[in-house]
Amino acid sequence: MKTSFGLLALAAAAKLVNAHATVFAVWINDEDQGLGNTADGYIRSPPNNSPVTDVTSKDMTCNVNGATAAAKTLDVKAGDKITFEWHHNSRDASDDIIASSHLGPVMVYMAPTEKGSAGSGWVKIAEDGYSNGKWAVDTLIANRGKHSITVPDVPAGEYLFRPEIIALHEGNREGGAQLYMECVQVKVTSDGSKTLPEGVSIPGTYTATDPGILFDIYNSFDSYPIPGPAVWDGSSSGSSSGSSKTTAAAPAATSAASASSTKAPATTAAPVQTESAKPATSTTQAAAPTTLVTSAKPTATATAGAGDSGSGSCSATAPATGVVKMYAQCGGMNYSGSTTCESGLTCKQWNPYYHQCVKA
């Protein structure tokens, strides 16, 4: 696939502050369970929609505050269709779900509640990556934030579902990938025979230099290696996009120092909303509900760049002499091509790694 790095950079810059996402709700067999990211909900929701960027952080398990149980637990059974509903700001029809520049895979893990809360026992039950020129995030946006799996035939008990997005618009540098995840509390009421395998630790299953974490979407590539373990062969889960995992080598990425903060700046506090309709599926009340912090709305500061922190880069090979055409690279760290743009254009610095010829 030939990727136009210039257009991707512009798209990323345009979406600078219109970017992040969290899971707002869950559907069971196409029945809306109501908002789950409220203080009395069933999702272990973070205080805002900022991503996790340090794959060794304990926040990788269920995001910030993820060790605290939610107030409710959804009752499900083997074979049920579970749909996770992602959003940027709200469930309104105008919501953009997640920035279209935030390309990457969508996955779902599952673990027994006690083990999963402690960061162990996580089993991947679904994954979508890159296939036929389309990313899983493209499909997620097209489906209005919805991504579905099927409940495996596991023994009865309480479990956590962990949907995850990895946004790779800054994945060309170490520490640049942005990970979004929450944990949804469920109680499996059917009593199946497919015991979950030992699973992996989260954090622990990813490293900052994994080919699917350190991945340059601005270079030409034909395939993408989804990080983490393989999908459990005892899972009945499929995925809504049908993308598959591949072991092809990732395109070359630029190595840079990791960001000083393990979390990218918050853009919007995760809103607490009220839901008048009662969920169609019964829920189990937890002993101590948690409070979703929304009193302070973080302020987003827009800075020029090809990604949220202004540090994304686009790699290209260009002649050292001559003039550079519109939207082509004209400068930046490790760039050795011409820095002279065609007449009527100027070489604009989007970030230290990428300068581009645009209209003056």
Swiss-Prot record:
Glycosylation sites (chain numbering): N334
Q: Which UniProt keywords apply?
A: Carbohydrate metabolism, Cellulose degradation, Copper, Disulfide bond, Glycoprotein, Metal-binding, Monooxygenase, Oxidoreductase, Polysaccharide degradation, Secreted, Signal
This enzyme's EC code(s) = 1.14.99.56
Task: Please outline what the protein is used for in biotech or industry.
Answer: Lignocellulose is the most abundant polymeric composite on Earth and is a recalcitrant but promising renewable substrate for industrial biotechnology applications. Together with cellobiose dehydrogenases (CDHs) an enzymatic system capable of oxidative cellulose cleavage is formed, which increases the efficiency of cellulases and put LPMOs at focus of biofuel research.
InterPro entries the record matches = AA9 (IPR049892), AA9_LPMO (IPR005103), CBD_sf (IPR035971), Cellulose-bd_dom_fun (IPR000254)
Q: Which GO terms describe its molecular function?
A: cellulase activity; cellulose binding; metal ion binding; monooxygenase activity
Q: What is its main location?
A: secreted
S-S pairs: C62-C183
Organism superkingdom: Eukaryota
Q: How is the cofactor bound?
A: Binds 1 copper ion per subunit.
| Cited Pfam families | AA9, CBM_1
Q: What does this protein do?
A: Lytic polysaccharide monooxygenase (LPMO) that depolymerizes crystalline and amorphous polysaccharides via the oxidation of scissile alpha- or beta-(1-4)-glycosidic bonds, yielding C4 oxidation products. Catalysis by LPMOs requires the reduction of the active-site copper from Cu(II) to Cu(I) by a reducing agent and H(2)O(2) or O(2) as a cosubstrate.
| Annotated domain remarks | Has a modular structure: an endo-beta-1,4-glucanase catalytic module at the N-terminus, a linker rich in serines and threonines, and a C-terminal carbohydrate-binding module (CBM). The CBM domain is essential for binding to and subsequent oxidative degradation of polysaccharide substrate.
Q: What is this protein called?
A: AA9 family lytic polysaccharide monooxygenase A
